[in-house]
């Protein structure tokens, strides 16, 4: 897929023509016209678990009793159920059951380090299901008042290479520790002793990829809203037990950690990382912001693309509405509606003559200058050399018709017009003269693990196939 992916160039009001995949942060921060979309509904949660999919619905649990869930991964509401209260849970599907780990007390607050990490099972996460029933929780890790570790902030990993189950736990007030659990029972493996793997972080999570084990930790201060300095850091190791080392060779046992994400875009305190793999090449990272300034300063669920660069996890871009060039990875040509190229007036002295007149800027071609000559009705779409002309600038806005994990469905049209990009039953794309709200005009936009983007219609006419916008040939867009 990589050869044919589509990526974007963003037209920022201040810094125009930034390529998102190489300068996304610059483009986002320089734009004052649009805000990045955030989860909608009731996404309010603190210390969220890794997102789990159960019977077509998404669930995440937080500190306190319960959590939030979503039908589509975009609109969230309360109602997820987790007994036991406690703090900072995690959830992992093993076979046809869900293992939930959580902590009771602990945290190093008030000078006490006493606490327990417990696990319990359920066949489903849907509280309305007749199969919904948690098993009795069992203690798998503990800490004492005077211990140099807190039994809190559980993180689960089922090693895909060995089938062994691991739990990390601990806080900023001591060591992060690793213990092994029995994947059949969720109990501590008999005789297993904890291993110290990090300091100066908490809310850890373990993941595996390409021969590396990664330890994601949350560094900084929590629970202070807009003043929280939480940020997510990472180290990696060839062995699950460490040592975990960052990008400059510092061990996490010595306080090292490569930054993954920090405060940004009027949101502070990212923490409690979780990884969600949708399919090969499409990954998401979930976490909370301690304070989202645009949502009353509340602690909220956040979902970002998870990218991989040089075998390091990287937080992807927060995609937001705006005007873009849609450019092919295959050749670098831009998506455009198939209209005649209108030449601009040229009043320039020959390049070999020394200028005799004051230099005068050339104004870009405007929509008003060319639109009257465009054909009415449906128009074909093609790929061509990018010339920043009106028929190559695409306005991408939320459609207000639901979403998917981490984003809303978008509508895409030529800027300043009602010519909307539409999928056809022939696996083609055209521009229709109006927005009907049909599934073929609702677009799912996701950043892939390599930093490029995938654009998919919500549904194709006459088929259930999931297809993406690609460059079939240098000049031929299509859906495949």
PLM ranges: what are they?
Residues 1-2, 35:
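Secreted/periplasmic carbohydrate-active enzymes, especially glycoside hydrolases
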Residues 36-349, 354-368, 376, 385-403, ...:
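Carbohydrate-active catalytic/glycan-binding domains of CAZyme proteins
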Residues 401-402, 435, 460-461:
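Short polar/acidic secondary-structure junctions
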Residues 350-351, 379-384, 429-434:
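Aromatic-rich beta-strand patches that line glycan-recognition/binding surfaces
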Residues 329-342, 414-427, 457-476:
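Extracellular/lumenal glycan-associated surfaces
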Residues 19-32:
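Bacterial N-terminal signal peptides
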Residues 3-22:
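Bacterial N-terminal signal peptides that target proteins for export
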């Amino acid at each position: 897929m990589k050869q044919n992916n589509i990526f974007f160039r963003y037209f920022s009001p201040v810094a125009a023509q930034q390529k998102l995949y190489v300068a996304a942060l610059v483009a986002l921060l320089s734009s004052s016209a649009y805000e990045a979309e955030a989860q909608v509904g009731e996404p309010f949660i603190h210390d969220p678990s890794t997102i789990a999919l159960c019977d077509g619905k998404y669930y995440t649990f937080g500190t306190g009793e319960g959590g939030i869930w979503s039908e589509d991964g975009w609109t969230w509401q309360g109602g997820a159920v987790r007994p036991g209260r406690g703090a900072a849970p995690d959830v992992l599907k093993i076979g046809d059951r869900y293992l939930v780990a959580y902590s009771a007390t602990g945290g190093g607050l008030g000078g006490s380090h006493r606490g327990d990490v417990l696990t319990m099972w359920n066949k489903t996460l849907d509280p309305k299901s007749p199969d919904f029933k948690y098993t009795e929780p069992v203690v798998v890790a503990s800490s004492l008042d005077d211990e140099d570790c807190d039994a809190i902030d559980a993180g689960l990993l089922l090693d895909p290479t060995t089938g062994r189950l691991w739990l990390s736990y601990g806080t900023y007030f001591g060591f992060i520790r690793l213990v092994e659990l029995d994947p059949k029972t969720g109990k501590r493996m008999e005789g297993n002793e904890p291993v110290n793997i990090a300091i100066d972080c908490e809310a850890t999570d373990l993941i595996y990829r390409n021969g590396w084990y990664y330890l994601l930790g949350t560094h900084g201060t929590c629970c202070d809203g807009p003043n929280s300095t939480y940020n997510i850091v990472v180290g990696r190791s060839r062995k699950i037990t460490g040592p975990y080392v960052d990008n400059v060779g510092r061990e996490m046992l010595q306080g090292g950690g490569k930054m993954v994400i920090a405060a940004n875009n009027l949101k502070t305190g990212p923490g409690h990382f979780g990884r969600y793999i949708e399919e090969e090449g499409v990954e998401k990272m979930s976490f909370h912001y301690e304070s989202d300034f645009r949502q009353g300063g509340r602690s909220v669920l956040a979902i970002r693309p998870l990218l991989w660069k040089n075998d390091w996890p990287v937080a992807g871009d927060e995609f937001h509405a705006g005007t873009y060039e849609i450019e092919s990875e295959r050749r670098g040509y831009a998506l455009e509606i198939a209209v005649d190229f209108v030449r601009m007036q040229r009043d320039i002295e020959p390049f070999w003559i020394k200028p005799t007149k004051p230099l005068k800027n050339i104004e870009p071609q405007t929509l008003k200058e060319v639109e009257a000559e465009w054909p009415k009705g449906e128009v074909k779409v093609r790929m061509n050399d990018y010339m920043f002309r009106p028929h190559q600038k695409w306005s991408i806005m939320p459609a207000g018709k639901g979403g998917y994990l981490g984003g809303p469905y978008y509508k895409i049209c030529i800027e300043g017009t009602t010519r909307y990009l539409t999928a056809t039953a022939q696996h083609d794309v055209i521009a229709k003269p109006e927005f009907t709200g049909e599934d073929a005009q609702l677009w799912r936009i996701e950043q892939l693990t390599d930093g490029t983007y995938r654009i998919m219609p919500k549904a194709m006419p006459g088929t259930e196939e999931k297809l993406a916008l690609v460059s079939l040939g240098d000049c031929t867009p299509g859906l495949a």
